[in-house]
Regions:
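Active-site acidic/histidine proton-transfer and metal-coordination neighborhood
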Residues: 60-192
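Short acidic, glycine/proline-enriched helix-loop-strand junctions
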Residues: 23-41, 108-121
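A short beta-strand-loop structural module common to alpha/beta enzyme folds
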Residues: 11-20
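Histidine-acidic metal/acid-base catalytic patches
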Residues: 1-6, 21, 26, 32-34, ...
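Short beta-strand and adjacent tight-turn residues that come in two discontinuous sequence segments
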Residues: 15, 41, 93
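Alpha/beta catalytic barrel-like cores
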Residues: 1-4, 18, 55-63
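Residue-level detector of anion-binding/catalytic polar loops
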Residues: 11-12, 37, 89, 160, ...
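Short glycine-enriched loops at secondary-structure junctions
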Residues: 42-49, 96-98
């Protein structure tokens, strides 16, 4: 897998939340041999024993069950250890979610069928927004408590914690809460990780303006997950094939940022190469 990434011309790769324990020996061999470098890991990596598919939300910092939060901490710390072993700079985190209806799927279906101007759509969108605000407090409190436990461990290891924006409406932090979050956690080891596809989906749904969002968080921005979105929510598409305006994002992209192409494994090599070329042509050498 890593050799295939290298053969596509990449010097660095991110180890994802789909890495099984059995894959580690080969990964470490490739890294130790200098065949590829690791920029970042996505929690949880490696997967817990017995879990064989990508499971970034297997355990959540927001879970009301203490045992589940303990497991989230345990496997996050294990991710930290692997990150140090492969000399990665950052670990990307999902912080958790609140219990509520699946508005994301309902709104997506309605958006595809009726569009944003539908009165029914706007009514459901407003209901979802109000429900989130009413339900978030306890989940956010648990997230903060858990982060206060793991942050010193990240600082001790010299790791950045990349707090990723999410596409599901129930996930934390909410779009308007990121600035409050970063005031609460002002450590330089806590940074913002912008998933371009997730931001685009939230724009389609009417919950986010990605450019304004990035403007407000530019000082904490450290990395990107790069992919496009086929309207309304077909993410992990090759850049240049969907609705993302990569040119509008260019001013936020800096040489020191970690940039990870997060593309569907079903894409043919040619589509990947075209997508990478689209971003490089648009962003230049940043």
């Amino acid at each position: 897998m890593l050799r295939e990434i290298r053969d596509l011309g990449f010097e660095y790769a991110e180890l994802s939340h789909g890495i099984r324990l059995g894959l580690l020996p080969g990964i470490l061999e490739a890294v130790d041999a200098g065949e590829i470098k690791i920029s970042s890991l996505h929690n949880f990596c490696p997967l817990p024993l017995g879990v064989n598919h990508a499971s970034p939300n297997l355990y959540e910092f927001s879970d009301e069950r203490a045992r589940q939060r303990e497991l989230a901490i345990k496997y996050t710390l294990r991710t930290f250890e692997l990150a140090r072993r492969v000399k990665a700079l950052a670990v990307v985190l999902h912080l958790g979610s609140m219990e509520m209806k699946d508005y994301t799927e309902k709104l997506t279906r309605m958006l595809e069928r009726d569009g944003r101007k539908s009165p029914k759509y706007e009514k459901l969108r407003a209901e979802a927004a109000a429900s989130r605000e009413a339900r978030k407090a306890k989940a956010v409190e648990r997230v903060y408590e858990t982060l206060r436990i793991i942050l010193p461990e990240a600082e001790r290891r010299g790791l950045k914690l990349g707090i990723e924006n999410r596409q599901a409406l129930e996930e934390i932090p909410l779009e308007g809460d990121f600035e409050f979050f970063f005031r609460e956690f002002d450590s330089p080891n806590v940074v913002y990780w912008h998933d371009i596809g997730h931001g685009q989906i939230k724009e389609h749904l009417g919950f986010l303006h990605p450019i304004q969002h990035l403007e407000s968080l530019a000082g904490r921005l450290a990395g990107f997950h790069i992919h496009d979105v086929v309207f309304p929510a077909g993410d992990h598409a090759a850049p240049g094939t969907g609705t993302v305006d990569f040119a509008a994002l260019k001013s936020f992209v800096k040489p020191g940022h970690i940039k990870v192409f997060e593309l569907s494994p079903s894409l043919p090599v040619g589509a990947v190469q075209c997508g990478v070329a689209h971003v490089k042509t648009t962003w230049g050498n940043e």
